[in-house]
Amino acid sequence: MNEDLRIYDVAIVGGGAGGIFASTISNYFNLNSILIEKKSYLGGQPMELYPNKFIYDFPCFFEIKSSDVIKKLIQQNKEQKNSNIQLDTDILNITWQTINEQELFLFETNKNSFYAKKIILASGNGSFNPRKLEINNEPIDSPFIHYSLNLETEIYKNKKILVLGGGDSAVEWANYFVEEKITNNVAIIHRRNEYRSSSFMIDCLSKNNILQKLNYEIIDFNESNKTLTIKHKETEKEQTLPFDYVLVQYGQISSPINIELLNQINKEKGKYVIDLNQKTNIKNIYAIGDATHFYCKPNTIITACAEAVRALWHISKNKKDW
């Protein structure tokens, strides 16, 4: 026990959109906070996986790139006098400690140790890696297979692009290539009959003249010929499509934070269960954003930011333990 360590009102775990905004808004509530981020940069999935993806549900913007949202959140945070952010920081352990009859969380990291009165988990899906393209349970590796859009988008100019997947990211990337006038030669291939995306973005696929192949599975990837062979799951009809690049959007495989104290938090579908005030079942621990499970809650940047405000509002109004 070290009584000389600094005590923060709030420790924010994770530097995605929700975490950055929580760090900023903590100043508004006169709470001194520290944000811990494992990577060397802020932004989470929007910066890591889809920096050029357009967002259509962010206030004051008809459309805005996710990376630009993150940049604005970071700039807003930098204007706060008491902003405290630690990058490249691994949390080694979190334990309960009692200092002067007050229960605190002791954080031990690869850089330093400190105390916190409250915790906000803004860790998203944890550390994540993209789900690889597999054929017959064998992962396919190729320089022509991409899992995120290369920022040097000139390499895609007027190229033949195949997008694999049927969720938001796959549908939005397919539209992105056409709408940004990068290339008009785009096809999207999905193993199911229906997309898992907004009706607005799905309608854009037809408006953008994107070739759509629903209910198809991948049966062959030929790197030398640059062709992808697909088979309809019902008719078993095969078709070979040429490509220059294949963009795989099969989602992510996450590795949650493995800390004994945090492992005691109730979870559903791998996410922290919260109440209306973002509280978990563990005293003084809150969770926001993609890290949480709440009935009918959309996982969007604006939702994560709103949840940051809700958690901090509750913390500021309830200074005592709950």
UniProtKB/Swiss-Prot annotation:
Catalyses which reaction(s): 2 reduced [2Fe-2S]-[ferredoxin] + NADP(+) + H(+) = 2 oxidized [2Fe-2S]-[ferredoxin] + NADPH
S-S pairs: none
Gene Ontology molecular function: ferredoxin-NADP+ reductase activity; flavin adenine dinucleotide binding; NADP binding
SUPFAM superfamilies linked to this entry: FAD/NAD(P)-binding domain
Keyword field: FAD, Flavoprotein, NADP, Oxidoreductase
Residues reported in the UniProt entry to bind FAD: E37, Q45, Y50, I91, F128, D290
Keyword Flavoprotein: yes
Swiss-Prot/TrEMBL cofactor(s): FAD
Pfam families assigned to the protein according to its UniProt record, in alphabetical order: Pyr_redox_2
Cited InterPro entries: FAD/NAD-bd_sf, FAD/NAD-binding_dom, Fd--NADP_Rdtase_type_2, Ferredoxin-NADP_redctase_2
Family: Belongs to the ferredoxin--NADP reductase type 2 family.
Alphabetical list of HAMAP family matching this protein: FENR2 (MF_01685)
PANTHER family: THIOREDOXIN REDUCTASE 1-RELATED-RELATED
Assembly and oligomerization: Homodimer.
Protein name from the UniProt record: Ferredoxin--NADP reductase
